[in-house]
Amino acid sequence: MGQFISFMQEIPTFLQEALNIALVAVSLIAIIKGVVNLYKSGLFQFFVFLALAGRSCTEEAFKIGLHTEFQTVSFSMVGLFSNNPHDLPLLCTLNKSHLYIKGGNASFKISFDDIAVLLPEYDVIIQHPADMSWCSKSDDQIWLSQWFMNAVGHDWYLDPPFLCRNRTKTEGFIFQVNTSKTGINENYAKKFKTGMHHLYREYPDSCLDGKLCLMKAQPTSWPLQCPLDHVNTLHFLTRGKNIQLPRRSLKAFFSWSLTDSSGKDTPGGYCLEEWMLVAAKMKCFGNTAVAKCNLNHDSEFCDMLRLFDYNKNAIKTLNDETKKQVNLMGQTINALISDNLLMKNKIRELMSVPYCNYTKFWYVNHTLSGQHSLPRCWLIKNNSYLNISDFRNDWILESDFLISEMLSKEYSDRQGKTPLTLVDICFWSTVFFTASLFLHLVGIPTHRHIRGEACPLPHRLNSLGGCRCGKYPNLKKPTVWRRGH
């Protein structure tokens, strides 16, 4: 250590010698050149590879390119399923045998058996939605019953009527639907079965051909072990679109913006993790993502953002609104959801191919600029998310598209800030400089000299060595072309 300190103290002294300076310069050049040669040889890269080989990369730092990363975003669906009256419905299947549905403060247990609890002679026959008012004194129960029958595809004017218990009786609310696959009721039973399969992904069909089968729905408490299955809710909302909204006017051709958890508009975008994301410290999806969603309607991520954004204001409004406005909410939500995407994912699920459950999304993030691609759904197969390697081509292409989009945007920005005239002047001046530099290197001669004599300026000589102006006679001496004087 003392030798190093002594050496540093002697630097100003030995640098006074020119030879020492030359030695220091040669040493520095040799060291730098040696490091560069080692780097170009690949030795450093080889040791880095040995140190990192076999280690796993976290999803947060999964590198695709130099400045692009593979990142994910997950939704928390708790904000959609609150306990407000007339809120979004919940559907649940327990042990593949018990079916439940919940809407607002009402909860029903749905069962199938061959025991007739209600009879046409003693109970209410339901042929129209207005007849449901004879079944219960609770608006929540009536509202949920009507919405459920609409969702399974029941036509109030063409399909067979069903029964409910008169609200004046003390036994409690219940309604009963004949789903027997017999006689003229067979077509309706198949239609009802199809509707139940769309609503409940694990629907157990206990009705046998040619046997009596009755569906009963009666109030019950919501089981605590029931999961919040938002996919069933999305299917439930879209099933009733033909009845609740015969003329769908929006068809996803509209613009929208994000709001915060209190419902206030934030045109500049809102950080989703503050109220509906599982992952913390996630970046904000601002005007860029919103603009992409306004242009691109074929995206599960955009559908979920629309549902989140609408649900906050809808719930706040519905607390003080009438039954008519409740129906309007159902119509509007149906217009917000992309039916094609839901049906496409449902078909994929039934065919045991990767499908989207609207929970986890991935996107490509540029670490330097902070720009990101539009999140895409992380597909599920066999009840588990696909590995990153299973859709490697997708995120590589998404990375290429992001880089291309960034370069295109940067080029457009530069084109907008730089006048074309200035670009032309710069280009032609560069061409002129290059041409003049070439001519300068070639060395074009400018005048004649008499060989072996001084420059004859200011006179100009002809090929005979005489003055071109005629002042001096021709000397008939050999001449040579010269450039300098």
Swiss-Prot record:
Segments of this protein annotated with the region HR2: 360-423
Residues anchoring lipid (N-myristoyl glycine): 2
Substitution effect: residue 40 to A: No effect on GP-C-mediated membrane fusion
Disulfide pattern: 92-226, 135-164, 207-213, 271-284, 293-302, 356-377
GO-annotated biological processes: fusion of virus membrane with host endosome membrane; receptor-mediated endocytosis of virus by host cell; virion attachment to host cell
Binding site for Zn(2+) 2: 447, 449, 455, 485
Record key words, sorted: Disulfide bond, Fusion of virus membrane with host endosomal membrane, Fusion of virus membrane with host membrane, Glycoprotein, Host cell membrane, Host endoplasmic reticulum, Host Golgi apparatus, Host membrane, Host-virus interaction, Lipoprotein, Membrane, Metal-binding, Myristate, Transmembrane, Transmembrane helix, Viral attachment to host cell, Viral envelope protein, Viral penetration into host cytoplasm, Virion, Virus endocytosis by host, Virus entry into host cell, Zinc
Chain segments carrying region Fusion: 250-286
Regions of this protein lying in the Extracellular compartment: 2-17, 59-424
Cytoplasmic side: 34-58, 446-485
Annotated stretches, region: HR1: 287-355
Site residues, Important for GP-C-mediated membrane fusion: 33
Impact upon substituting residue 55 to A: No effect on GP-C-mediated membrane fusion
TM ranges: 18-33, 425-445
Result when mutating residue 2 to A: Reduces membrane fusion activity. No effect on GP complex formation
GO molecular function, one term: metal ion binding
Record's keyword annotation contains Phosphoprotein: no
Annotated site residue numbers, Cleavage: 58-59, 251-252
Keyword Zinc: yes
Protein residues bound to Zn(2+) 1: 57, 459, 467, 469
CC terms in the record's Gene Ontology section: host cell endoplasmic reticulum membrane; host cell Golgi membrane; host cell plasma membrane; membrane; viral envelope; virion membrane
Name recorded for this polypeptide: Pre-glycoprotein polyprotein GP complex
Provenance organism: Junin mammarenavirus
Gene name, Swiss-Prot/TrEMBL: GPC
